[in-house]
UniProtKB/Swiss-Prot annotation:
Alphabetized NCBIfam families for the sequence: PRK09284.1, PRK13352.1, thiC
Molecular function as annotated in GO: 4 iron, 4 sulfur cluster binding; carbon-carbon lyase activity; zinc ion binding
EC number(s) given by UniProt: 4.1.99.17
Pathway participation: Cofactor biosynthesis; thiamine diphosphate biosynthesis
Keyword set, alphabetical order: 4Fe-4S, Iron, Iron-sulfur, Lyase, Metal-binding, S-adenosyl-L-methionine, Thiamine biosynthesis, Zinc
Protein's name in the database: Phosphomethylpyrimidine synthase
Lineage, broadest ranks: Bacteria, Pseudomonadati, Pseudomonadota, Betaproteobacteria, Burkholderiales
Cofactor: [4Fe-4S] cluster
Source domain of life: Bacteria
Cofactor binding remark: Binds 1 [4Fe-4S] cluster per subunit. The cluster is coordinated with 3 cysteines and an exchangeable S-adenosyl-L-methionine.
Catalysed reactions listed for this entry: 5-amino-1-(5-phospho-beta-D-ribosyl)imidazole + S-adenosyl-L-methionine = 4-amino-2-methyl-5-(phosphooxymethyl)pyrimidine + CO + 5'-deoxyadenosine + formate + L-methionine + 3 H(+)
Length: 637
């Protein structure tokens, strides 16, 4: 479906499903050292424990929130106007940027002057910004100068998840508050494989990690609407959602809707991979309405400008595309600068060849001209553009394996070493960098990927697509990849790129986006637990407590997808009265293991003994009863 100009100009509306608050949740804000640092969280209300289980109060639980203003009932959402400029004052007060008269890219100016696009164009009233001559506006540049920016303080508060507040509320919950706090804060020791995860995230720790290149805050100065977030091995594992139109499917309205839907369910960043019509206009609508960082693959649009002929690409066209997108506010670029001419023959014996779109484009260009890639040769010039807008590099893995057969081969690791070399070049310019990774990798080969990335890329954040652990399940590749994502996240990957059920089959719709997001939220959280990230088990413990106490609504609401959990429960037990029942349809009222355990505990309390003693005593009583009845195995009814 192509974009409808009249629809966009006159009737563009936010997706109603994306703005409704999640059940029993409310948006709250934590204020930092200045009034304009207001960090959003989602607070989930809980019911009190039933009297028969102690009657204690269960305080609200705070969770990370990526949905921006969309789930705040106090916010007025109008996608035709875009989101508030959260970071505008922070950017301007640093005094190192200038306002341009308008777009400076040839393509950007041409689109602005095309009257046929007026009806569909986002009505942006402000000009783009750029660093003043000689200035560097990256978060890494500030960090290396010892400056803690508002963005750094913001992410420090965000990563802490108001944990101290939750601990205090547990202790104040009643006479058993201290005991309750100990129980709900209990967490198994993790294995972080050498990561340096602190007990508490401070603004200074954030600054130090960015200065070292171990973390990035993707935040273009032309995306003031973004709510800062951090990607790094020593922080919570993040996930990315891919959206984007194609030549045969989807338009601007649908892509904005996918973005708002993705962030509702937990997408930390979104990549717009559009390759169809109106790429420039689609991206503008997405960025102006996105509270999360937006990434792109600029070579896709550059290819469209030469009618899909890779050999016709030039440095000048690519450079103009970088500037065009940087002035719109793209926060990170995937650039496949590691696909070098000498590496292409290494893929000859692969089962699936070069599967990266960007990688195949550059491979074709290199072979057509029999020259080294202009992305590699002009890399320092690319860095000059990046640091003028604070666009982060996502150095693309154009030679990633497209099947388990090709995993961990010579081509893949030759490119990885090159990405490590380019990382150091970017850091020389104080440009933020993360490294993209595979792909398709059997489970036993995943850890090697993480170890070599840390070695060759100097601990720059790793950002992987899965990896898919088997190739036998088209239609279920969110699962085949979720397995690999959980493992590589545990080993140290900082951000996981989601895979939807439509992977290898078609363009994902809204349902596919949600399925991919939830799958990857599970993988990321499982990785945080395995790494021993402080406080990672709090939500698990709260949900387990609700489950044991048959607080069904709390079970639904504390989960990643309350709607689906409630829907499944309602399929067999739809009545409201069943939301307090001490069983579900799996086992019924007489075989619920948790109900039986509670019966044992009640018996123990009535007898003044421990639960273990009660089990022993109960068995003895049954033995005596058995003997009194004649010690017969069977009795007539």
């Amino acid at each position: 479906m192509n974009a409808n100009p009249k629809f966009l100009a006159a009737t563009a509306e936010v997706d109603a499903a994306a703005v409704a608050p999640l059940p029993k949740s409310r948006k709250i804000y934590e204020t930092g050292s200045r009034p304009d640092i207001r960090v959003p969280f989602r607070e989930i209300e809980q019911q009190d424990t039933p009297t028969m289980f102690g009657g204690e109060r269960n305080p609200p639980l705070t969770v990370y929130d990526t949905s921006g203003p969309y789930t705040d009932p106090q916010a007025h959402i109008d996608i035709r106007r875009g989101l508030p400029e959260l970071r505008r004052a922070w950017i301007e007060e640093r005094g190192d940027v200038e306002l341009l008269a308008g777009p400076t890219s040839d393509y950007g100016r041409a689109r602005l002057q095309d009257p046929q696009l007026t009806a569909m164009r986002f009505d942006l009233r402000r000009p783009p910004r750029r660093a003043k001559d000689g200035a560097n506006v990256t978060q890494m540049h500030y960090a290396r100068r010892g400056i803690v920016t508002p963005e750094m303080e913001y992410v420090a508060i965000r990563e802490s998840l108001r944990r101290e507040h939750y601990i205090e509320s547990l202790r104040a919950s009643g006479p058993e508050g201290e005991k309750m706090a100990r129980r709900l804060l209990r967490q198994h020791p993790g294995q972080s494989f050498g990561a340096a995860i602190p007990a508490a995230i401070t603004p200074e720790f954030v600054r130090d990690e960015i200065a070292r290149g171990r973390a990035i805050i993707p935040a273009n100065i032309n995306h003031p609407e973004v709510e800062p977030m951090i990607i790094g091995r020593n922080f919570l594992v993040k996930i990315n959602a891919n959206i984007g139109n194609s030549a045969v499917s989807s338009g601007i309205g649908e892509e904005v809707e996918k973005m708002t839907w993705a962030i509702r369910w937990g997408g930390d960043t979104v990549m717009d991979l559009s390759t169809g019509k109106h790429i420039h206009e689609t991206r503008e609508w997405i960025i102006r309405n996105s509270p999360v960082p937006i990434g792109t693959v600029p070579i896709y649009q550059a290819l469209e400008k030469v009618d899909g002929k890779a050999e016709a690409l030039t440095w000048e066209i690519f450079r103009d595309t970088l500037i065009e997108q940087a002035e719109q506010g793209v926060d990170y670029f995937t650039i496949h600068a590691g696909v070098r001419l000498p590496f292409i023959p290494m893929t000859a014996d692969r089962m699936t060849g070069i599967v990266s779109r960007g990688g195949s484009i550059m491979a074709k260009w290199c072979l057509a001209h029999h020259k080294e890639s202009f992305l590699y040769e002009r890399f320092e010039e690319i860095c000059e553009i990046m640091k003028a807008y604070d666009v982060s590099f996502s150095l693309g893995d154009g030679l990633r394996p497209g099947s388990g057969y090709d995993a961990n081969d010579e081509a893949q690791f030759a490119e990885l070493k090159t990405l490590g070399e380019l990382t150091q070049v970017a850091w020389k310019h104080d440009v933020q960098v993360m490294i993209e990774g595979p792909g398709h990798v059997p489970m036993q080969m995943i850890k090697e990927n993480m170890e070599l990335q840390l070695e060759h890329c100097h601990e720059a954040p790793f950002y992987t697509l899965g990896p898919l652990t088997t190739d036998i399940a088209p239609g279920y590749d969110h699962i085949t990849s979720g397995i690999g994502a959980a493992l590589i996240g545990w080993y140290g990957t900082a951000m996981l790129c989601y895979v939807t059920p439509k992977e290898h089959l078609g363009l994902p719709n809204k349902k596919d986006v949600k399925d991919g997001i939830i799958t990857y939220k599970i993988a990321a959280h499982a990785a945080d637990l395995a790494k021993g990230h402080p406080g990672a088990a709090v939500r698990d413990n709260a949900l387990s407590k609700a489950r044991f106490e048959f607080r069904w609504d709390d079970q639904f609401n504390l989960g990643l997808d309350p709607d689906t959990a409630k829907e499944f429960h309602d399929e067999t037990l739809p009545k409201d009265s069943m939301k307090v029942a001490h069983f579900c349809s799996m086992c019924g009222p007489h075989f619920c293991s948790m109900k039986i355990t509670q019966d044992v505990r009640e018996y123990a309390a009535s007898q003044g003994v421990s639960a273990q003693q009660a089990l022993t005593q109960g068995m003895q009583e049954k033995a005596i009863e058995f003997v009194k009845k004649g010690a017969e195995v069977y009795h007539r009814s």
